[in-house]
C-alpha cells in the first residue's frame, strides 16, 4: 500500500533527524570563510565584562542575546520533543527560535502538535516556516491560520533549490517564485523573512530582493550543514554526487554580498556558526543576529538542560569576544568590524 502524502512527509522528517544525528552531514571541504577574518583584540579595553550588553531587537521582539535557534524539524513524533526542549531553552535564555517547515501541519492537523511551543515559551520570538517552492498566494489563509495556531511572531520562507533537486520527488519548479513571494509578503499580515537552508544567499539573489519588502534575510551560507548531503543520505544511503554536496556560497561571503546590496535589511548569519567567535565576526560584519541549528539537535533530543548548557557556553564566549575587542554592546562591535587576513 502506498503511504498517504502526509505520512510520507512525516517519515521523511524523521529520516532527516536520524541522518543528522548519525551521518557526516557537514561540508567536507568548503568552509564558512570566517577563518579569513580576525576580530581585532584590544588589550586596553575599557569595558567591564559583567556590563557588556548583548541585547538587541529583531523582528519586533527584544532578545537578551543576538541568537536564534535555527529551523530544524516538525511533523514527526520526536520533533515535538525536540521543539519543546529548544523552546524552553530559548525561554530561559531570552533568545529566539525558528520552527521547522509547517507544510506538514497544513497537510495534517495531527502533526500540528509537534509545533506547539507556546506552553513552555510564552515570551519567545517564534518564527514560523514554509518552503518557497510550495508557496502560493492561495495558501495565505491556511498559512496565517498555521502561524496563529502556534502563536508565531513572523514567518521564514526558505528557498532551497539544491536541496529539492537532491530530494526524492522534490519540488523543483521555482519558476514564478519571486512574484509569489511578493504577493505573500504583501498579503500575509505577518513579517516575512527569506532564508536559505545552508547553501547561501548571495549577490544575485539579493539583487532580486531589492524591491521585495521582506522583514529580514537569513543568508544561511555554506560551511556548516549541507542539505544536499543530507538528502543524498536519505535518498541513496550515500553521497552519490559529492560535488553537489559541496556547492554553496560560504557564509562570510554571503553575508558580505547581501549586506552590500541590501544595506538596510536586517540580516541573519547562519551556516556553520559554531562558536561565540564565529558569531562575533558575523555580527561585526553586519549581521543583526546569528542562528544555530544542527549543533543543538543532539542536545535537544537529550534534554532542555543540554540545550541550555550548549547555548550558554556559546553566549558566554560571545560576551568575552565583545569585552576583548573593547565593545560594550553590539553597535560598538559593528563599529570595530573585522580585519581580513592576508
UniProtKB/Swiss-Prot annotation:
Keywords: Cytoplasm, Flavoprotein, FMN, Isomerase, Isoprene biosynthesis, Magnesium, Metal-binding, NADP. Involved in the biosynthesis of isoprenoids. Catalyzes the 1,3-allylic rearrangement of the homoallylic substrate isopentenyl (IPP) to its allylic isomer, dimethylallyl diphosphate (DMAPP). Disulfide bonds: none annotated. Homooctamer. Dimer of tetramers. Its EC number is 5.3.3.2. Mg(2+) binds at residue 164. One of its GO terms (molecular function) is isopentenyl-diphosphate delta-isomerase activity. One of its GO terms (cellular component) is cytoplasm. It is found in: Cytoplasm. FMN binds at residues 71-73, 101, 129, 195, 225, 272-274, 293-294. This is Isopentenyl-diphosphate delta-isomerase. Belongs to the IPP isomerase type 2 family. It comes from the Bacteria. It is an enzyme of class 5 (isomerase). InterPro entries: Aldolase_TIM, FMN-dep_DH, IPdP_isomerase. It catalyses: isopentenyl diphosphate = dimethylallyl diphosphate. It comes from Mycolicibacterium gilvum (strain PYR-GCK) (Mycobacterium gilvum (strain PYR-GCK)). Its cofactor is FMN; NADPH; Mg(2+). Substrate binds at residues 12-13, 101-103, 163. It holds the Pfam family FMN_dh.
Amino acid at each position: 500500500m502506498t503511504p498517504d502524502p502526509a505520512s510520507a512527509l512525516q517519515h521523511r522528517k524523521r529520516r532527516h533527524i536520524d541522518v543528522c544525528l548519525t551521518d557526516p552531514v557537514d561540508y567536507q571541504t568548503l568552509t564558512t570563510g570566517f577563518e579569513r577574518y580576525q576580530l581585532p583584540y584590544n588589550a586596553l579595553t575599557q569595558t567591564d565584562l559583567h556590563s557588556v550588553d548583548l541585547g538587541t531587537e529583531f523582528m519586533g521582539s527584544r532578545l537578551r542575546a543576538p541568537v536564534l535557534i535555527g529551523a530544524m524539524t516538525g511533523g514527526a513524533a520526536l520533533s515535538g520533543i525536540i521543539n519543546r526542549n529548544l523552546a524552553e531553552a530559548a525561554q530561559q535564555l531570552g533568545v529566539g527560535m525558528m520552527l521547522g517547515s509547517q507544510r506538514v501541519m497544513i497537510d495534517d492537523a495531527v502533526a500540528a502538535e509537534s509545533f506547539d511551543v507556546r506552553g513552555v515559551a510564552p515570551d519567545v520570538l517564534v518564527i514560523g516556516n514554509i518552503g518557497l517552492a510550495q508557496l502560493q498566494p492561495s495558501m495565505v489563509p491556511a498559512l496565517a491560520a498555521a502561524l496563529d495556531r502556534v502563536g508565531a511572531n513572523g514567518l521564514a520562507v526558505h528557498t532551497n533549490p539544491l536541496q529539492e533537486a537532491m530530494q526524492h520527488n522534490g519540488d523543483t519548479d521555482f519558476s514564478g517564485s519571486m512574484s509569489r513571494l511578493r504577493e505573500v509578503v504583501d498579503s500575509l499580515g505577518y513579517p516575512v523573512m527569506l532564508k536559505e537552508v545552508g547553501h547561501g544567499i548571495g549577490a544575485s539573489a539579493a539583487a532580486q530582493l531589492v524591491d521585495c519588502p521582506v522583514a529580514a534575510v537569513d543568508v544561511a551560507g555554506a560551511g556548516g550543514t549541507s542539505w544536499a548531503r543530507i538528502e543524498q543520505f536519505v535518498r541513496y544511503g550515500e553521497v552519490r554526487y559529492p560535488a553537489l554536496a559541496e556547492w554553496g556560497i560560504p557564509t562570510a561571503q554571503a553575508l558580505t554580498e547581501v549586506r552590500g546590496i541590501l544595506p538596510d535589511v536586517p540580516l541573519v548569519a547562519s551556516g556553520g556558526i559554531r562558536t561565540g567567535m564565529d558569531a562575533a565576526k558575523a555580527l561585526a560584519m553586519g549581521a543583526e543576529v546569528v542562528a544555530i541549528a544542527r549543533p543543538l539537535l543532539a542536545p535537544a533530543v537529550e534534554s532542555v538542560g543540554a540545550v541550555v548548557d550548549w547555548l550558554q557556553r556559546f553566549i558566554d564566549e560571545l560576551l568575552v569576544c565583545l569585552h576583548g575587542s573593547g565593545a560594550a554592546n553590539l553597535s560598538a562591535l559593528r563599529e570595530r568590524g573585522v580585519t581580513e587576513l592576508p
